[in-house]
C-alpha cells in the first residue's frame, strides 16, 4: 500500500529532476514474490494519484513477479517505449548514483576476471547473490562495492541502470537515498 516513503519519493523526485509530472509504474494484482497484493491495483493506483502521481501504469505480471533484473528490464522498457520520459528516479539504500553506475557497468560488461571469480565461488557452493558479491569484491578490491549488492533497493537500482544501458535509452537516472519504509 501507499506509504510515507512513496510520498517522499514522489516529492523528492520532482524536486531532484525538475519534473512537473510523475509517472509511476507498479505491480498489478501480484507483487515481486508472486504473492497477491494486499490492496487491489485500483486502490493502490488511486492512492498514488491522490498523492502526486500524474499517471500510474501497471507493470505486466511477467515482469512484476520476476527477478530484480527482469522487473527492472520491464519497467525501463515500458518507460523507454513511451518515448517521452526524461528521467527515472529510483530509491536505493546507498543513495549514490556514481557507485551504483560503476557496479552496473562492471556487471554489464562481465569481464573475464569477474566471470572467473563468480564461477569459482559458485563451484564452491556459494549462492548466486553471495558469489556475485564475492566476485565483485575480488574484482574491485573494494568491500563497499560488494556490500552495496547486499541491499535489495541497491540491487534493483543497479538493474535499472543496466537496463537503461542495454536499451541505449536517453532516460537520465537519478537515485534517492531511502529514508522511509
Where do the language-model regions lie?
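Active-site cores that bind ATP or allylic diphosphates and position pyrophosphate for catalysis
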Residues: 58-181
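Receiver (REC) domain switch/active-site residues of two-component response regulators
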Residues: 20, 54, 86
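N-terminal catalytic cores of NTP/NDP-binding nucleotidyl/phosphoryl-transfer enzymes
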Residues: 1-44
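Divalent metal-coordination and catalytic microenvironments
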Residues: 3, 48, 161
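Non-catalytic positions within long, well-ordered alpha-helices that form the structural scaffold/packing
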Residues: 14-15, 49, 76, 80-81
Amino acid at each position: 500500500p501507499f506509504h510515507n516513503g512513496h510520498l517522499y519519493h514522489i516529492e523528492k523526485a520532482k524536486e531532484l529532476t525538475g519534473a512537473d509530472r510523475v509517472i509511476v509504474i507498479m505491480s498489478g494484482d501480484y507483487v515481486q514474490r508472486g504473492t497477491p497484493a494486499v490492496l487491489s491495483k485500483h486502490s493502490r493506483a488511486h492512492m498514488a494519484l491522490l498523492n502526486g502521481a500524474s499517471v500510474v501504469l501497471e507493470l505486466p505480471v511477467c515482469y512484476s513477479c520476476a527477478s530484480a533484473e527482469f522487473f527492472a528490464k520491464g519497467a525501463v522498457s515500458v518507460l523507454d517505449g513511451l518515448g517521452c520520459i526524461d528521467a527515472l528516479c529510483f530509491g536505493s539504500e546507498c543513495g549514490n548514483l556514481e557507485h551504483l553506475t560503476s557496479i552496473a557497468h562492471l556487471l554489464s560488461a562481465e569481464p573475464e576476471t569477474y566471470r572467473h571469480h563468480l564461477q569459482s565461488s559458485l563451484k564452491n557452493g556459494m549462492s548466486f547473490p553471495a558469489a556475485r558479491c564475492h566476485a565483485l569484491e575480488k574484482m574491485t578490491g573494494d568491500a563497499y562495492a560488494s556490500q552495496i549488492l547486499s541491499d535489495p533497493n541497491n540491487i534493483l537500482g543497479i538493474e535499472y541502470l543496466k537496463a537503461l544501458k542495454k536499451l541505449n535509452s536517453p532516460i537520465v537516472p537519478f537515485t534517492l537515498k531511502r529514508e522511509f519504509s
